Amino acid sequence: MSSYSYDPYYTSYKRRVVESSPRVHIRSSYVSPSRTTYSPVVSSTMRRSYAASSSSSSSLLHGVDTMDLSQVAAISSDLKIVRTQEKAQLQDLNDRFANFIERVHELEQRNKVLEAELLLLRQKHNEPSRLRDLYEQEVRELRLAQEEATGDRQTMRNERERLEDALRLLQGRYEEEALSREDAEARLLDVRKEADMAALARVELEKRMDSLLDEIAFLKKVHEEELAQLQSQVQYAQISLEVEVAKPDLSSALRDIRAQYEKLAAKNMQSAEDWFKSRFTVLTQSAARNTDAVRAAKDEVSESRRMLSAKGLEIEACRGVNDALERQIQELEEKQSGEIAGMQDAINKLEEELRNTKSEMARYLKEYQDLLNVKMALDIEIAAYRKLLEGEETRLSFSGVGAITSGYTQSAPVFGRSAYSLQSSSYMTSRAFPTYYSSHVQEEQLDIEETIESSRAEEAKAEAPEEEEEEAGEEEAEGGEGDEGEGEEGEEAKEEEAEEEGEGEEKEEEEEGEGEAEGEAEGEGEAEGEGEEEEEGKGEEPAEEESKKKKKKKKKK
């Protein structure tokens, strides 16, 4: 890009050509880095000042016919590139804006679905009163059943205690009968011993009787032998007596002896028979007595055995009844414990479902609140984009094409400042229109910032700690942007002051080119430039000071 400077303090004029590349200044955080904007707008004041200055040098403009047309073509191509980039960036912004709108519609649809789900959950949460009544009714019925089972259990326990008392009585009677049986068995043993002794005595007496009978038989035999011997002797004596008449008569002596022995034998036999009869009678009586006692003992033992077996059967029956009652009680306890465990599990499940429902409802409410916050943030972002788009449309209504700065210098060396390169639209327009554009843009920025701050204040009420941190971060980012803007303006001011000191006077602002670029669809690439000088730097300083004051106020906010 070429620029020309004019110095009226020298007698001769000299053309000074300065080549400079277009500068890019990105002020918005949401545009692509390749975007460059500029708005070379020409005001009526600039036109008047340029007419005044160009009237003196109109005679010299005919000498610039030899200007390099390639530079003009380069400027036109640069302007085309810039316009193409602006168009592409606008299309990109439109696409992003459409995507944001689609996202907002999608979030609205999801919001409606979540509201419907929340309404259903609230209805479900309000309905469980009837379900609670049903559960309470079932719990009451189960408690009544439990109380009935408890009463039955108490009755069974009382019956069990009664049977245990009866069992204890029967056990006492059984022990008494066992003692009586032991006594009877002891007496039976005694009787058996006596019977055995009697049997032994009888056997002994029988043996003695046999021995006595043998002795009697032996004595009879001996007596018979003696009698036969005596008879033979008597006969021999008679014979001898007959033979010998003079021999004495011994028959009388023998008869006496025989009579004595017979008396003695009869007496012994009679005494033995009497003793035997008396002993036999005694033994017979004793045996009869023992037999009666044994029979009575046997009868008593059999009766005791019968009673013992009967009592044993009764005890077994009582034990069976007791076991059956214990099993029934155990079954009832197990059944009741199972029912109680089932009811407890059901209650735990219901409580768990209630907790899950509450947690799910809380989660849905949190998601709904998050979606509301996202929606609010998107609404704020959409409002900010709308404000930015409106400001962009307002700026584009004043946009131009480019600027060609021309002029002549004296033949002597000139230390003039080079032409301004293409800068951002906001910066160039603020310099070209210090009275209108700066105030207008600042008002729009303040309105946008006030809208954003009010929306952030509402978000801060909903999301206290986290949103406050985000606000602080965003304010710091905005402060950084403001500092960058102030730094750039400060640098430009320093450059101007340095150039003004080199020239030794207050210079007017250099002219800006206004170019009109036709649409690329028509394929036209013509560019027309008109150079005009701006007002003096003194008219721009109050606007810059006012913008700095507003930025300081914004930082304080």
From Swiss-Prot:
The record's family statement is: Belongs to the intermediate filament family.
- Composition-biased stretches (Basic and acidic residues): 453-464, 539-548
N-acetylserine-modified residues are 2
Return the Gene3D superfamilies for the record: 1.20.5.170, Single helix bin (1.20.5.500), Vasodilator-stimulated phosphoprotein (1.20.5.1160)
Beyond the main fields, what else does the record say? NF-L is the most abundant of the three neurofilament proteins and, as the other nonepithelial intermediate filament proteins, it can form homomeric 10-nm filaments.
Output the InterPro entries linked to this UniProt entry: IF_conserved, IF_rod_dom, Intermed_filament_DNA-bd, Intermediate_filament
Q: Where is this region: Coil 2A?
A: 249-267
What this chain does, per the record? Neurofilaments usually contain three intermediate filament proteins: NEFL, NEFM, and NEFH which are involved in the maintenance of neuronal caliber. May additionally cooperate with other neuronal intermediate filament proteins to form neuronal filamentous networks.
Q: Where is this region: Tail, subdomain A?
A: 393-437
Q: What is this protein called?
A: Neurofilament light polypeptide
Ranges for the region named Linker 2 are: 268-276
Looking at the record, which segments are called Tail, subdomain B (acidic)? 438-557
Q: Does the keyword Acetylation apply?
A: yes
Record key words, sorted: Acetylation, Cell projection, Coiled coil, Cytoplasm, Cytoskeleton, Intermediate filament
Task: Tell me the organism's taxonomic lineage.
Answer: Eukaryota, Metazoa, Chordata, Craniata, Vertebrata
Start-end of Acidic residues biased regions:
465-538
A family per Pfam: Filament_head
As for subcellular location, the record says: Cell projection, Axon; Cytoplasm, Cytoskeleton
GO CC annotations, alphabetized: axon; cytoplasm; intermediate filament
Segments carrying the region annotation (Disordered) are: 452-557
Query: PROSITE patterns recorded for this chain?
Result: IF_ROD_1 (PS00226), IF_ROD_2 (PS51842)
